[in-house]
């Protein structure tokens, strides 16, 4: 008996990787790839995958209820990756809460109406923190009662959405069956197409090859995008397996891999040093001072808000996020989902470095065309 899967956010960094892996799954009769918009080159890539499995591209809004109901019709599994990721406070709070929280709630309701039995949610490490750069979390695990206390819209919205997904586990579906859910909390995701890495590299290329310091004092365990996608495949397999499902239903899992624990600055450097990019060697402000400057910038932004929208370069949340010791173990995912990274650190590094090389080449071409 064939089954079908809807992937929301399928045009994003993670969503498209999940789609590529889904094509390999047995007895999968249809993949529905949903997003607000798809780049032409991704549409072309998806059309090539049609030879393997029926792949339907759906463009629409996560807040459009009739659209979601149509998208969920006759679907066996929903993988919900769609969200607004915003750690710098660029996007309006209401937009983030609408897409990340209300959109998730509407999708859960659409699953009930369409009797979709399996729902997998892409959560975030930020649901757990960090709340203070002074608090050290090393090899954190699911049994620790960690919860983000920042009012910042992105982590707050992901926390509420994850709670909604896990609370929906056990809901009755329209056809009398039961909805089963789980959530995956990846650590910082890097890899080809990564928006934060891309921004850092492009900024350095326009700054004499000097990488700006984003997190000199941090120790984190970044995770390769291909391994996060693989964890989603294993989660759907587990929730569809009567033997494995009971221990996975209603659970959340930290997803990391064997990428070495390091600072954000060091990761950016390792992935770009062969192209001559280097770390900023200038003296940097002490962390405590950075934190309180961040607070002052927030106050200025708030006071100016009635007349002017001032976007501070950093705030207390970004200082904390970028400079904490915050690492997590994937042992629970290993135990319940049989998760083992699909890509080693060496493979992940090689693939990402090749992609960074393409950014460097593109920059050179741009410079060449400007001088002609």
Swiss-Prot record:
Residues annotated as catalytic: 154
Record function comment: 3-beta-HSD is a bifunctional enzyme, that catalyzes the oxidative conversion of Delta(5)-ene-3-beta-hydroxy steroid, and the oxidative conversion of ketosteroids. The 3-beta-HSD enzymatic system plays a crucial role in the biosynthesis of all classes of hormonal steroids.
Keywords, in A-Z order: Congenital adrenal hyperplasia, Disease variant, Endoplasmic reticulum, Isomerase, Lipid metabolism, Membrane, Mitochondrion, Multifunctional enzyme, NAD, Oxidoreductase, Steroidogenesis, Transmembrane, Transmembrane helix
Protein name: 3 beta-hydroxysteroid dehydrogenase/Delta 5-->4-isomerase type 2
Gene this chain is encoded by: HSD3B2
Expression (tissue specificity): Expressed in adrenal gland, testis and ovary.
Effect of residue 250 to V: In AH2; nonsalt-wasting form; loss of 75% of enzymatic activity for the conversion of pregnenolone to progesterone and dehydroepiandrosterone to androstenedione; no effect on endoplasmic reticulum location
One protein family per Pfam: 3Beta_HSD
Any GO CC annotation of this UniProt entry: cytoplasm
Transmembrane segments: 287-307
Family statement: Belongs to the 3-beta-HSD family.
Molecular-function GO terms, alphabetical: 3-beta-hydroxy-Delta5-steroid dehydrogenase (NAD+) activity; oxidoreductase activity, acting on the CH-OH group of donors, NAD or NADP as acceptor; steroid Delta-isomerase activity
This enzyme's EC code(s): 1.1.1.145, 5.3.3.1
Taxonomic placement: Eukaryota, Metazoa, Chordata, Craniata, Vertebrata
Single biological process term from Gene Ontology: C21-steroid hormone metabolic process
PANTHER family in UniProt: BIFUNCTIONAL POLYMYXIN RESISTANCE PROTEIN ARNA, SHORT CHAIN DEHYDROGENASE_REDUCTASE FAMILY 42E, MEMBER 2
Organism: Homo sapiens
Residues annotated to bind NAD(+): 158
Effect of residue 167 to V: In AH2; late onset; almost normal activity
Record flagged with keyword Oxidoreductase: yes
Metabolic or biological pathway, per its Swiss-Prot or TrEMBL entry: Lipid metabolism; steroid biosynthesis
Disulphide linkage map: none
Disease the record associates with this protein: Adrenal hyperplasia 2: A form of congenital adrenal hyperplasia, a common recessive disease due to defective synthesis of cortisol. Congenital adrenal hyperplasia is characterized by androgen excess leading to ambiguous genitalia in affected females, rapid somatic growth during childhood in both sexes with premature closure of the epiphyses and short adult stature. Mild HSD3B2 deficiency in hyperandrogenic females is associated with characteristic traits of polycystic ovary syndrome, such as insulin resistance and luteinizing hormone hypersecretion.
């Amino acid at each position: 008996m064939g089954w079908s899967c809807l992937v929301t956010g399928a045009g994003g960094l993670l969503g498209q990787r999940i789609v590529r892996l889904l094509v390999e799954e047995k007895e999968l009769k249809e993949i529905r790839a949903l997003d607000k918009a798809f780049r032409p080159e991704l549409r072309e890539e998806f059309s090539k995958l049609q030879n393997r499995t029926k792949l339907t591209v759906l463009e629409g809004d996560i807040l459009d209820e009739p659209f979601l109901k149509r998208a969920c019709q006759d679907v066996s599994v929903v993988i919900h990756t769609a969200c607004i990721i915003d750690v710098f406070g660029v996007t309006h709070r209401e937009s983030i809460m609408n897409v990340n929280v209300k959109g998730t709630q509407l999708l859960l309701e659409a699953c009930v109406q369409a009797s979709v039995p399996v729902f997998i949610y892409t959560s975030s490490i930020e649901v757990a923190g960090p709340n203070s750069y002074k608090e050290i979390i090393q090899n954190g695990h699911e049994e620790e009662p960690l919860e983000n206390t920042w009012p910042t819209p992105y982590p707050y919205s992901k926390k509420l959405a994850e709670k909604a997904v896990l609370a929906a586990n056990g809901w009755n579906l329209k056809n009398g069956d039961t909805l089963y859910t789980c959530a995956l909390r990846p650590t910082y995701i890097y890899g080809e197409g990564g928006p934060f890495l891309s921004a850092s590299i492009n900024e350095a290329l326009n700054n004499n090859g000097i990488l700006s310091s984003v997190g000199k004092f941090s120790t984190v365990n970044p995770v390769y995008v291909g391994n996060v996608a693989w964890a989603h495949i294993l989660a759907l397999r587990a929730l569809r397996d009567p033997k494995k499902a009971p221990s996975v239903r209603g659970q959340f899992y930290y997803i990391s891999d064997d990428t070495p624990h390091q600072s954000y600055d060091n990761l950016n450097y390792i992935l770009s040093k062969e192209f001559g990019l280097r770390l900023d060697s200038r003296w940097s402000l002490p962390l405590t001072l950075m934190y309180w400057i961040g607070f002052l910038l927030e106050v200025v932004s708030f006071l100016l808000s009635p007349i002017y929208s001032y976007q501070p370069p950093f705030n207390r949340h970004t200082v904390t996020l970028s400079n904490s010791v915050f690492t997590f173990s994937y042992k629970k995912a290993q135990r319940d989902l049989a998760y083992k990274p699909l890509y080693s650190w060496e493979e992940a590094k090689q693939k990402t470095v090749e992609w960074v090389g393409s950014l460097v080449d593109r920059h050179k071409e741009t410079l060449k065309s400007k001088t002609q």
